[in-house]
Amino acid sequence: MADESNTGSIAAAVAPNADVKAPAAKKKRSPRRQKAVAEPRRAVSETPAAKPRRYSEQQRKEKLKLIETQVTEGKVTLKDAIKSAGISEQTYYQWKRTVKPVEQKAEKRLPTGEELADLVRLEEENQRLRKLLAEKLRAENADLRKRLGLD
């Protein structure tokens, strides 16, 4: 702590040849820019409001088909085809994802006569093997019960 009873001169505390730095001059700032003049607001009736569009399933399929044909023909890139259809990329990929499972279900083909006969034969063999396995397991269980004296 500082000694309060010390009444020595302040000049004695500071070295006489110490480097004394002059306070640095403050930087001058340029004056602030004036605020931009606000543009007059347009009337609500003048600007057409962007209303959300709802497309039917048929319209979605048509737009997707149009985009695919443009891209496969090599006329334009995928991004350009999507923009020309008037939808966003996100919308395109969402539509593509929802339409694809429906098409995959429709593409499921039925087995032909020869394949059907093979399936029937395999199912019969599967049943026969299951019965054989069940008989073996029953015999093994009976043998273990006799050894353990449970029967």
Swiss-Prot record:
It comes from Rhizobium meliloti (strain 1021). Belongs to the SyrB family. This is Probable transcriptional regulator syrB2. The keyword Repressor applies. The keyword Transmembrane helix does not apply. GO terms for biological process: DNA transposition. Transmembrane segments: none annotated. It comes from the Bacteria. Residues 24-35 have a biased composition (Basic residues). Seems to affect the transcription of cya3. May be negatively autoregulated.
